[in-house]
Amino acid sequence: MRWMTFAIAILSTTVSPSGQSQRPAIIDLWTIGKPAFGIYAPNENAGPRGQGPRPAVYTREGGEKLAMNPLYDFVFLNLEGSYDGAAIKAIADGLRSISAAGHKALIVRIPPIEKDGADATRTRVKEAFDAGADGVTIPHVRSVDEAKQAIGFFRDARANVWSPANRTGDRIAMLMLEDPAAVAQAREIADLTGYSILACGIGSLAQALGGDREGAEAGTQKVLAEARRAKLVDMLTFNAQDAGKRVKEGFLALLTQGAAADDAIRAGRAAAGR
């Protein structure tokens, strides 16, 4: 009887009426200081190489395929360039299929505030969660004030955000700093409350620095240091060659893509003792 009571209690705290987990497993990894590994949701309409970009397509079937791979802790759906609410639902539904190998968190990157304005961004944050996302990323945050505004969108969405001040949260809020002026404010932004992940967009930062990869790496390390000081997660892209280095440095969310993604994640898991 005691075992049945315990089991019911666990189920009631981890599963919603729709069957969607209330607390992504990656949060439990982060709580014990273990890194999580994820993959970009691939565009299912990429087309042959050399023919230029096509409109991105994301389907439930694509989500189901990702769900069956036990290596992935999370899936990162990049809608920064072209927001598509239907794509969020399609991938979320696919990730929750009965064939899924564990619960993979879905983190959605939406367009930056500067692109379509605060009202559109606020609406998209709520819409993404309503469609089944576990987390939302707001890229190109330019200042402390804009970071405060972005964090407010998660409050407006009534998301129970996991953060250093709220370890019982079940949703993920992520901010990205991608230009030198924003990175210079990393300490002040890290000191803000109400969000989960602070990351540096290393590629965008390098571009903003005129292609200076060393400068972008230095900026990335600055953001990492501030994130770790504030007990925030930091996310970064990686590959098989630098997996061990990034794990050792303390990045708790590592993201990859492409044909070599599984090999990169295997290398990362091995380095992390997973």
Label each PLM-derived region with a short phrase:
Residues T5-T14:
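Bacterial N-terminal signal peptides
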Residues P17-R274:
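Expand to "…catalyze enediolate/carbanion chemistry for C-C bond making/breaking, isomerization
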Residues M1-W3:
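Positively charged n-region of N-terminal signal peptides that target proteins for export
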